[in-house]
Amino acid sequence: MSELSQGVRGAQQETVTEQKIASTLGSGGLAVYATPCMIALMEYCAMESVRPYLPQGSSTVGTRLDIKHLAATPIGMTVRCETELIEVDRRRLVFLCRAFDEAGLIGEGTQERFIVDDEKFMEKVSQKIKK
């Protein structure tokens, strides 16, 4: 984990399909790229960008989002996400996130993730069921 530092970048993309539109997901009534899908792509992009730097048996979990969805994207267009790690504070990671369609910027903001030990994290989660 010592190699993880500011400046790590990620990039991911997906095509807007019927399954990824607001009217299908219930997040809106129109046939445009759904905000939850854009956010999920941003989270995936950030998560994957730092995965090679994490110790074995560790992951990151999302804890905070401040995202603006700026423009609508129709079915069939490709959405590209870019992330940059802008802050590292022990296990806390902050990413700048931007999403683009073929016409330009459609979303931007920041995302916070924490590095967790997979086994300890899942043990804590499983304790909820036992209560």
Q: Where in this protein do the model-derived segments appear?
A:
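Hydrophobic beta-strand-centered segment that forms part of the acyl-chain substrate-binding groove
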Residues: 47-80
